[in-house]
Amino acid sequence: MGTPGGGRRWMTLISITLLMVVGLGLYWDELSLSAGISPATSPRRAEGLLLGRLPLPMEPSILSPLEHLIEPPLQYKLMTIRHIPPVMPGTGMPHPYVGDCIQCHLMVGGPAAGSQFKTPYGAVLENLSRVRKLGPPILPTTRQPHPPAGRCIKCHDIVVKVPVEKKSGIKWLL
């Protein structure tokens, strides 16, 4: 059998440990505030306080390998846009930002279609594209390899990447 009072020692040790844990829990907020870490501190700033420097904006964080394991990268599919609707100024964006709206869209109440600057050569290309689009499909960020010919959509189909899973919360209106 055990020694007399052995059960009391364990109970006393457990009680003291429990009191220390509760005390540390109550004092934890004071410890973190004195270190400069508040509940509103971003993970990037907390990491900087702990490691002594702020990571660069594009530098992976300490937890990024774990984040990549938990959440796989987004899968994209290509979508061809053959018609771009006019938009009202001041309305929300129906897709992620690609550039100035007027690069692709006509504004309701703005300049009319065909009022964009174009060279005579560009005007001929635009007129020929009314029957069948002459240009190859392009990305929205493609640089113009020819003289100005009005809006790109008149001669080219625009190819965009659309996420397969709509986790991002962006409502795609295409």
From Swiss-Prot:
Q: Which ranges of this chain reside in the Cytoplasmic compartment per its record?
A: 1-9
Q: How is the cofactor bound?
A: Probably binds 2 heme groups via the magnetochrome (MCR) motifs.
Where along this sequence does the record place binding of heme 2?
A: C152, C155, H156
Q: Which residues lie on this side of the membrane: Lumenal?
A: 29-174
Q: What induces it?
A: Part of the probable 17 gene mamAB operon.
Write out the transmembrane intervals.
10-28
- Which key words tag this protein in UniProt? Biomineralization, Heme, Iron, Magnetosome, Membrane, Metal-binding, Oxidoreductase, Transmembrane, Transmembrane helix
Q: Where in the cell is it found?
A: Magnetosome membrane
Chief location bin:
membrane
Q: Record's InterPro entries?
A: MCR, Multihaem_cyt_sf
Q: Name the NCBIfam families for this protein.
A: MamT (NF040992)
Q: Summarize the protein's role.
A: May play a role in magnetite crystal maturation. May transfer electrons to balance the Fe(2+)-Fe(3+) ratio during magnetite formation.
Q: What is the protein named?
A: Magnetosome protein MamT
Organism placement in taxonomy? Bacteria, Pseudomonadati, Pseudomonadota, Alphaproteobacteria, Rhodospirillales
Which gene holds the coding sequence for this protein?
Answer: mamT
